Amino acid sequence: MASHKKSEDPLVVKDRQEQECESSDSTIASENASEHRSPMGLIDEDGIETLNRIASQSSRRRSSVYPPNVPTRTSTLATISENDPAVDPQGPSFDLNKWLKMVLRESERQGREAHRTGIVFKNFTVSGTGAALQLQDTVSSMLSAPFRIGEMMKNRHSPPKRILNEFNGLLKSGELLLVLGRPGSGCSTFLKSLCGELHGLSMSKESVIHYDGVPQQRMIKEFKGEVVYNQEVDKHFPHLTVGQTLEFAALARTPAQRIRDMSREEFAKHITQVVMAVFGLSHTYNTKVGNDFVRGVSGGERKRVSIAEMALAHSPLAAWDNSTRGLDSATALKFVEALRLFADLSGSAHAVAIYQASQSIYDIFNKVVVLYEGRQIYYGPAKDAKSYFERQGWECPQRQTTGDFLTSVTNPSERKARPGMENQVPRTAEDFEAYWRKSPEYQKLMSEISHYEQEHPLEEEGDALATFQQKKREIQAKHTRPQSPYLLSVPMQIKLNTKRAYQRVWNDISSTVSTVISQIIMALIIGSVFYGTPDATAGFTAKGATLFFAVLLNALIAMNEINSLYSQRPIVEKHNSYAFYHPATEAIAGVVSDIPVKFVIAVVFNLILYFLAGLHRSAGQFFLYLLVTFIVMFVMSAVFRTMAAITQTVSQAMGLAGILILALIVYTGFVLPVPSMHPWFEWIHYLNPIYYAFEMLIANEFHGRDFICSQFIPAYPNLSGNSFVCSSAGAKAGQRAISGDDYIQVNYQYSYGHVWRNFGILIAFLVGFMMIYFIATELNSSTSSTAEVLVFRRGHEPAYLRTDSKKPDAESAVELSAMKPTTESGEGDMSIIPPQKDIFTWRDVCYDIEIKGEPRRLLDHVSGWVKPGTLTALMGVSGAGKTTLLDVLAHRTSMGVITGDMFVNGRGLDQSFQRSTGYVQQQDLHLETATVRESLRFSALLRQPPNVSIQEKYDYVEDVIRMLKMEDFAEAVVGVPGQGLNVEQRKLLTIGVELAAKPKLLLFLDEPTSGLDSQSSWAICAFLRRLADSGQAVLCTIHQPSAILFQQFDQLLFLARGGKTVYFGPIGQNSNTLLNYFESNGARKCADDENPAEWMLEIVNAGTNSEGENWFDVWKRSSECQGVQTEIDRIHREQQSKTQASDKDNESWSKSEFAMPFWFQLYQVTYRVFQQYWRMPEYIASKWVLGILSGLFIGFSFFQAKSSLQGMQTIVYSLFMLCSIFSSLVQQVMPLFVTQRSLYEVRERPSKTYSWKAFLIANIIVEIPYQIMMGILTYACYYYAVVGVQDSERQGLVLLLCIQFFIYASTFAHMAIAAMPDTETASAIVVLLFAMSLTFCGVMQTPTALPGFWIFMYRVSPFTYWVSAMAATQLHDRVVQCSPSEMSIFDPPSGQTCGEYMSSFMSMAGGQLSNPNATSDCNYCSVAVADDFLSSVNIYWSERWRNFGLMWVYIVFNIFLATMLYYTFRVKKWNLSGLKERFSKKK
């Protein structure tokens, strides 16, 4: 079969393939270094017994049940040799058993005991705020907001809602607590509350919670690092290696007293190596942690890094929130085993929430708590929980794990009462809670709490607090404040953070180098533009412009720090919660690490610019210039860092920074000199650090110098006396040179005497903003607990919510979903699924890719089929290639070479194959602003064929909604997690979108149960079962099914590592067929109570059967394998005879790539994007606010520009300032386009929903109306303020030009982002192109003064034509009246009037005399009308409409280039391997 190269998001493909390859690499590594597999794998049986003995003795000493005089550890501890290589974690014979014995012995010898604590909570009630009903905001609701103030105020003060209701419990030192509950039941809130993470939450006054007698408030304030919470999301610095990440954590929590008197560094390195060995991370020591964009360790390894990092915090009490998500069952079990070991030996206590806990995991826990809609319905010994609920009247199905059973009783659709108990069992969460409170187990718990509190009474200043403080002081470093929760002193924290900051810089050196290179390029461009500027009066403006660019480019480079600070804020907050360091110390370290980087950038940039632009070549002037630019770089860095620290979101910070930059540029003193400033905004320049820096640079350049006059007035030969004057400001009659000091005083009101005063002001700004930054970083936290709630369209909210009545069993707590999970109603009508007859087969499919220059086979001769009415499971060990096979079969791979055969009914696949199949991806990608019904309708409209009417498609969508039981939230908005659909609802929508397309071949599903709890997983699989029973063909990858879940499937395709088949065939009743195959080929017998899926994973993971044969080889020689090939041949013969007869009836569209014609696609996609924009009021408001504020600010800064020469110049500069918001306009558009593109390229394009042309054109079209509105608003705010009311033609043209400018900005944004992978990359290109366009538009350097090389850039820059058209329209025929400082004043020769003396000069040069009849003090203005001024900068009134037309050419060019770039780089798949081969042959 020919190689298939279909499109998919390359990041998704790369991440998946790297993980699969790394998994196979890890397997090889683990075979060679088995000691790194797991904590349990490191200990022999004798060692386990010894440790268990030690652990049980420790547990007895801590337990209130056993007397305290139990014998201590055995004397075998003393027999360990300190030089034993078994305690070296890097050695091949490392033994965790012996290492732990050594540590225990050392601790005993030093008289230290591990710090231990338990936790007691009584009447523990936690509440949050959030409206029960949330409606979607739109542009119309935004505009009508002033008329709905009452409604908004009412919603703002919604009453608090209970999330946890009167919990009671006791977790002792050394115990493990399993937290069970369905998503939204309050598990995360419970774990956070145990650790004092109460952002956005509140505890009731009656709540009691303490740690062995220490109140929670005191605990969090002084002992924050003793109780830590591990969140579900992995947050790490991506560029740090695993070793650096974990060694940092170890150093931050290294105690003052250490084993063997190791130094801090030695201890941290040693303990890190041990933890890495325990969690199987030793082979990743020098590998970057990475993230979605930075290549690093695999997702499972990153999760283990998070676990290891928190383990290094050495906390006696830890809460783990679904920390096994993304880990396979074996790794998850080993993680819990490690917690068990740590708890037994160190006395630490752990509370762990796990969604799908296998029986082997469950059995490790001491206690379990079951949550039901925020209510506690059991808390007690894990071994007694099952019997408690069975006694309550519930039946546990055979082979169901205890964890699944306990969670299932909270699901009305899954729980099953024992015969005869149907009317006696509790039904609602309140009933369950009431039953629990009356039970003997509850009474026993309360009695245990009472006894425990007698031993550990709650006291503000008691023995427990004193013990905590003493133990903390023992491990705290010197000079650390006693009340501080941190182990390190502030200087030590700064030192540690600074080291890490430099590691981050070095590991991401390419970013620093690219910044330096971009600055070199900008310096070369700006320097060359002003190259050859004369040291004469003709160079005055050019020198000012050079220094203006210098100070701005040095200052504004720091704006990028806002994004970097926001990206690291979640990591810093996590470390702070672990009591690693003060956030302020990390902020200080960030500033310190920036010094050398900024120094290099400053030196490189300014060295090039200074000498290339011909600034004053004097050592004193150069070094002062360098000092000023370096200081202003740091001052502005402090300003932008402060912006990031005082705001809550990056959009707030960037919006604030955008307005700030505009104010800083305008009030620097160049485009609007101090004499021209208006009183209402004049105060800004006093608060502007750049103003003070610019005054220093100007004074430094011009001070103490006389500049030769370039042009005299009048320009007669043999001038003498006072009959002439230089044409520049500050000139005096009869002088042939102008003092630089006089020029800057007249033109700018600057003085050299202010230089060192300004330097002091800059230092004050630096210190002030740095202090605010450090304080704000320490105090401001963006972490908050948000309500998980559904959002509805206005006017479409469900009746029971609209009337505030409570739906039966509705979950009302903030953390809970706004309604019952969707899988609890009836079976759903499956009759709407059209019967299918097509059979999909594949034979000997192989998939090869190249990794690091080496060929790698990911799939190895896989064969199989999917028939209508069957549910086929695709399983395998981690990294076996399950998702890869699904992608290959669905034609969704974007790289590599596929060989083998794929057939539908025995015939090859045509281009309609992709749209004839449904593919439910693992990621639930949907348009956030659309409702569930709209998402389904969009899929049906574009993917069902044209012979189906629109009404029929809509009717089918309603059937799908009923079938998936989504009626209650059909009008709910998809939203984002927490504010929109929950995990299960998103998964159902993902399935629904594919069903709405009515796929006529089969349905692929990739991990449909990923991230779901066991009940939701069961509901999804039961639905797939019903789907298959109705005639649908289904192929589904599944990670780790329970025994009951496994029985839902008909067939199984099982892959071993490397994509090798080890079984394909029926599963059989109770998995008998599958078990018989493996057992007959040398596998051990599967026990009756064992999960066949786990059993099979275990034996295949072992690699070989009892005779040492590889399972892949066993399969290849088996009769079952031969039977597969025979069955494929039979299917082909049978189906080919059937399909020949039906081929004649096929419509032409049935073979086409897309179901619907292009114009229908374009209409539907454009309508959807319009709808999306309308429902994004924040985005639209940010656009309009930017336009309005910019227009008003520029308009009133340059208000009623005078008719003087400076007035003409300020009008042109005002246009320059309008152009300066161009970059912000582009930056607004690009992120939204990237979001749209991700959805299209990952889900909609591979499904052949619509064409890439429709996608691109629709996105360009939809921006235009909003850009037109933005142009109108900006025009109204800017134009009339600056120039007042002009004739209608001019007003109309300026309006058109304003609209045109914003349309150009949006098309430019699409052109820039079309081919780029992300906004960051595109932004760098945008900034460069924008800077060049702005520099060469003729405002800062006139075209006549440009070096010849750059003239082409003046002609290429679109701003040249836009500024020219705008300036000409506003200034044409305007009479100029020079201000007194602009007048050239001189005396005519005796006997002549001024008019007579100047007549010949004025006949050639133009201009005007204000006193032609005077015989002294002639007042000459060099310009009579504004057109004379404009012609000097190559701007002409006659070219205004031509320039307007040229701008449309640029807009069309942007659209054309966007289309070509998108097609070339993101649609067209180039055969690069073929090109390589051809090139190598030529060589």
Swiss-Prot record:
Transferase recorded as keyword: no
TM spans (from-to): 512-532, 539-559, 595-615, 620-640, 654-674, 759-779, 1179-1199, 1215-1235, 1254-1274, 1293-1313, 1320-1340, 1444-1464
Pfam families linked to this entry: ABC2_membrane, ABC2_membrane_7, ABC_tran, ABC_trans_N, PDR_CDR
Reactions it catalyzes: (R)-miconazole(in) + ATP + H2O = (R)-miconazole(out) + ADP + phosphate + H(+)
Induction trigger: Expression is highly up-regulated in azole resistant strains and in the presence of miconazole.
UniProt keyword annotations, A-Z: ATP-binding, Cell membrane, Glycoprotein, Membrane, Nucleotide-binding, Repeat, Transmembrane, Transmembrane helix, Transport
Glycan attachment residues as annotated in the record: 32, 123, 322, 718, 780, 947, 1146, 1413, 1471
Subcellular location: Cell membrane
Record's compositionally biased regions (Basic and acidic residues): 1-19
Domain of life: Eukaryota
Binding-site residues, ATP: 876-883
GO terms, molecular function: ABC-type transporter activity; ATP binding; ATP hydrolysis activity
Membrane topology term: Multi-pass membrane protein
One GO cellular component term: plasma membrane
Chief site of localization: membrane
Domain ABC transporter residue range list: 147-398, 840-1083
Disruption phenotype: Leads to slight miconazole susceptibility.
InterPro entries: AAA+_ATPase, ABC2_TM, ABC_trans_N, ABC_transporter-like_ATP-bd, ABC_transporter-like_CS, ABCG_dom, ABCG_PDR_1, ABCG_PDR_2
Regions of compositional bias (Polar residues) in chain numbering: 71-82
Chain spans, region Disordered: 1-92
Keyword Glycoprotein: yes
UniProt similarity note: Belongs to the ABC transporter superfamily. ABCG family. PDR (TC 3.A.1.205) subfamily.
Function summary: Pleiotropic ABC efflux transporter involved in the basal level of azole susceptibility. Confers resistance to miconazole and clotrimazole.
Protein name: ABC multidrug transporter atrA
UniProt organism field: Aspergillus oryzae (strain ATCC 42149 / RIB 40) (Yellow koji mold)
Encoding gene (name): atrA
